[in-house]
Structure formats: structure tokens, C-alpha cells
């Protein structure tokens, strides 16, 4: 609630409250420019990677076929197992007969060959190798069937409610098998989790890597954008005939990172073009507004009953950085939720109320307010002195 009997309610435009460092906003790429290509893809999404705020979306909950984007989940589970210490990048992995038989995009693993686990992860993430992805799954959990079960469990943990994995590679299914299914929104949730692992971004942004002691080169399936789009960190491509051309990507400039998702593009060129437009829309129209503590000209305080002071000043417990367009910044409202009065004694840095940041009726952020110093309970002598002062003031 934004109002109650014990809280003061204010609607204050943020520019009057905070010192803001603002660069000129450009509108080179508008939402309309992004939407003009919507007939060329099945779903799209753009999000701020830090806050998770979705800035643009189109059919984001529609069922789609991820194709090789399933390898994002393979990578996530493998990285989580690596970080737990249960496996190591230096582990030796013997290629199974099953892994060697997987077709499609591959690095031509042969049964009985031995690779470092790191090499197989690189082949999976950089080159989207289906055979390497199976070998990774088998090493991590013993078999791809057990691994697929874990993929679906992890998807549910992340809230990927429209996702169902049936493979570790994303290839079109054989007779009697089912297609992997997901949604742009679910893949956004997966991408948010993946970027918490710097090693994944190091691999996915690698354009070219040697394999088999330099006799084979792993070319990133997103190599064109990695080379030509400033800040592109890669992530993962996917394609088969029914899926269309898919790309989940992340790009970072000047500390600002966006996640872009294009699903079902008609060809790789259109996939790259719409990805550029999405990312341009983010970089050109949004920026981080630094709402740095509370401005010196504006102060909040709470009344203190029975204290040596009648009021105690309050400060925000943290700086607030919000990604906004210039127009959104003008509409931003800040609502202090402060108790009318609190009883003494009051501790230093005691939490008393909150600041709420609202945009178009939606709560974007809430931070606690705390006292700047302690207020002791009023002593008998102080209370008597105060009473005498008040009495003398009435004569």
C-alpha cells in the first residue's frame, strides 16, 4: 500500500529530490523501428540485464522451438556443477559411442577419443557442437537422459513454465520423439541466470578457438555480430527448419548490459538485423539515472515521542540507479513512506520507513530509510526543563 493511517503520503517528482547526472538522450532507434520487422520473426524481447526490467517485447509468451538454444541450459548446469567442485575443467572425458553418433553441427568426435572437459564446453558454447553437448551431459550426470531430467527441474526452478526439454542438443526429433519447446520470456529468465557466470560470457564472446591441438578451429556461430557490433558478448544461436533462426545475445557498453532475444527469424541476416535494432533501441533510448542518496536540499525526518529531540533526520540506505528513458524519468514519482511518530529511544541507523519509486502505477524500486543518529529517551530533568520553558513562553 502507498497510504495508511500512520504514514505520510507525498507525490514528488524525482528531479526535485535528487541530483541527477543526465546525458542527452537520443532517439535514433525507436520502438516503431523495432516493430516494423515483426513479420520477419516469431518473438522478440529486450531487457536490462542488471535489473531484469523488460524494455520491449513481442509475443514473448508464445510457444517457440529453441533449437540449439537448449545448450544454454546445458552450459548453466555444467557451470553450476563446476562451481560446486564436483567436476573440473581439467577432467579427462572419454567420448562415448552415443556422443560420436550425434549429427548436425558437430566437431566430429570419435568414440574413445579423450578430451579435457574444458575443450568440450568450448565446443558446445562457441561452436554449438551437438556431439560435444552430449559428451558434456554424460560427463556431468552420467547420461543425457538423467541430464535432460535435471534440465527440466532447473527450468522449473527458474520459473520457465512454458519450457520442456527433450534433448541436450536441440536437433529436430526423430520418429516418436518430441521437439524442445520454450518461449522468449523463459529464455530471458535463463539468460539472466547465465550471465551470473563470467566464464560463459568469456566463451560465448570468443570468435575463434582452436580444437584438437590446433588441427580444428571452433568458429563462433554468432561470429559476425561479435566482430561487427560494438559491445557484443555473444551468447547462443539456434536453428532448425521448424524453429527458424534464433539468437539470444548480450551486449555491454559503458557498464550497461542488455539481453536481446530474437526467435524464428526467416534467415540469419534478418536475425542479425533485428538483434541490432533491438540493442540499438536500448543503447540509444535508455540510460542509467543515478539517484544518489537524497539531495542535500531535501531531507526527511520522523517525529520522536518522548525523546531528547522532537525529530530525527532520515537517509536512504543505498544509492538508487534506475534505467529509464528521458520521458520515463519525467514521469517518475517518489513516495516517502514515513511513520508520523516513533517512540524514544531511537537507535542510530534504525530503519524507519521507505522510499518507493513508481512509474505509471508500477513499483520499480523500494529502499529503506534509516536514522542518521540516535535519539535518547528524554530524562526527567530534561522533561522538567522543557515544561518550564514552555510555561515561560506562554507568559
State where each predicted segment sits.
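Bacterial N-terminal signal peptides that target proteins for export
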Residues: 2-15
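Bacterial N-terminal signal peptides
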Residues: 14-24
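Generic marker of residues within folded, mature protein domains
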Residues: 20-21, 34, 83-85, 241, ...
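Bacterial Sec-dependent signal peptides at the C-terminal "C-region" and cleavage site
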Residues: 25-33, 370
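Generic structural signal for hydrophobic residues
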Residues: 29, 150-151, 221, 278
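Active-site-adjacent loops and short helices of periplasmic peptidoglycan-processing enzymes
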Residues: 30-189, 194-198
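Domain-terminus/edge residues, biased toward the C-terminal soluble/receptor-binding domains
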Residues: 160, 175-395
Amino acid at each position: 500500500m502507498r497510504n495508511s493511517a500512520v504514514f505520510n503520503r507525498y507525490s514528488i517528482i524525482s528531479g526535485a529530490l535528487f541530483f541527477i547526472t543526465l546525458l542527452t538522450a537520443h532517439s535514433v532507434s525507436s520502438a516503431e523501428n523495432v516493430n516494423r520487422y515483426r513479420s520477419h520473426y516469431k518473438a522478440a524481447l529486450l531487457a536490462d540485464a542488471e535489473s531484469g526490467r523488460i524494455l520491449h517485447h513481442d509475443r514473448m509468451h508464445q510457444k517457440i522451438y529453441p533449437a540449439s538454444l537448449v545448450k544454454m541450459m546445458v552450459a548453466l548446469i555444467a557451470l553450476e556443477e563446476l562451481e560446486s567442485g564436483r567436476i573440473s575443467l581439467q577432467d579427462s572425458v572419454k567420448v562415448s559411442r552415443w556422443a560420436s553418433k550425434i549429427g548436425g553441427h558437430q566437431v566430429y568426435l570419435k568414440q574413445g577419443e579423450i578430451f579435457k572437459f574444458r575443450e568440450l564446453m568450448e565446443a558446445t558454447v562457441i561452436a554449438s557442437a551437438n556431439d560435444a553437448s552430449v559428451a558434456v551431459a554424460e560427463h556431468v550426470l552420467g547420461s543425457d537422459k538423467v541430464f535432460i531430467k535435471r534440465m527440466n527441474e532447473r527450468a522449473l526452478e527458474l520459473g520457465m513454465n512454458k519450457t520442456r526439454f527433450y534433448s541436450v542438443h536441440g536437433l529436430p526429433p526423430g520418429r516418436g520423439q518430441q521437439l524442445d519447446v520454450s518461449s522468449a520470456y523463459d529464455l530471458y529468465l535463463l539468460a539472466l541466470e547465465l550471465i551470473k557466470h563470467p566464464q560463459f560470457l568469456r566463451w560465448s564472446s570468443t570468435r575463434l578457438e582452436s580444437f584438437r591441438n590446433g588441427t580444428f578451429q571452433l568458429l563462433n556461430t554468432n561470429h559476425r555480430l561479435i566482430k561487427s557490433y560494438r559491445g557484443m558478448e555473444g551468447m547462443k544461436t539456434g536453428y532448425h527448419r521448424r524453429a527458424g533462426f534464433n539468437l539470444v545475445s548480450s551486449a555491454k557498453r559503458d557498464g550497461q548490459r542488455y539481453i536481446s532475444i530474437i526467435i524464428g527469424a526467416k534467415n540469419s541476416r534478418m536475425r542479425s538485423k533485428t538483434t541490432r535494432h533491438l540493442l540499438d533501441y536500448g543503447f540509444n533510448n535508455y540510460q542509467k539515472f543515478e539517484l544518489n542518496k537524497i539531495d542535500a536540499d531535501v531531507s526527511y525526518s520522523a517525529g520522536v515521542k518522548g525523546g531528547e529531540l522532537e525529530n530525527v533526520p532520515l537517509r536512504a540506505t543505498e544509492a538508487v540507479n534506475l534505467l529509464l528513458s528521458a520521458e520515463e524519468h519525467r514521469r517518475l514519482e517518489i513516495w516517502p513512506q514515513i511513520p508520523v511518530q516513533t517512540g524514544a529511544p531511537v537507535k542510530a541507523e534504525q530503519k524507519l520507513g521507505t522510499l518507493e519509486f513508481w512509474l505509471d502505477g508500477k513499483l520499480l524500486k523500494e529502499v529503506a530509510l534509516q536514522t542518521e543518529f540516535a535519539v535518547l529517551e528524554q530524562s526527567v530533568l530534561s522533561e522538567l526543563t522543557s515544561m518550564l520553558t514552555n510555561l515561560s513562553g506562554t507568559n
